[in-house]
């Protein structure tokens, strides 16, 4: 997926679902938020990437939307201090790769919400591969 596509999809997800987590964010504002984008290459000998990704996501957060045909899932993981700051994730399974984009908004006190959400996903993904 192109970076512009990721930004646009993530902005749509944030503007639609942020109010459920105590945030009011318009798409225009969401497009201007700082975003951490990470691409992971994952080798799977025990199953397909999408199924493992979905299993991991169901363990560590709340799945918001899912497009099975395109291998795309959007999710929110409560992270940061006391797990009260939402991190919005957009993931795409493509063969053995998972393309991961995370958006979070830290205030004056940095809670490293995006990093913690990524760590939570990676841990859940490792558990899914092991089961």
Segments from the language model and where they lie:
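Ser/Thr-rich, low-complexity intrinsically disordered terminal regions
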Residues: 1-131
């Amino acid at each position: 997926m192109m970076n512009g596509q990721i930004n646009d999809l993530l902005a749509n997800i944030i503007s639609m679902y942020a109010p459920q987590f105590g945030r009011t964010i318009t798409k225009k504002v969401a497009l201007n938020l700082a975003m951490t984008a990470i691409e992971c290459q994952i080798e799977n000998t025990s199953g397909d990437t999408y199924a493992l990704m979905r299993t991991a996501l169901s363990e560590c957060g709340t799945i918001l939307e899912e497009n099975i045909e395109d291998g795309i899932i959007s999710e929110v993981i409560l992270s940061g201090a006391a797990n009260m700051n939402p991190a919005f994730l957009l993931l795409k399974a493509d063969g053995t790769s998972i393309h991961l984009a995370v958006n979070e908004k830290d205030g004056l006190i940095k809670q490293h919400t995006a990093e913690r959400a990524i760590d939570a996903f990676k841990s859940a993904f490792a558990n899914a591969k092991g089961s």
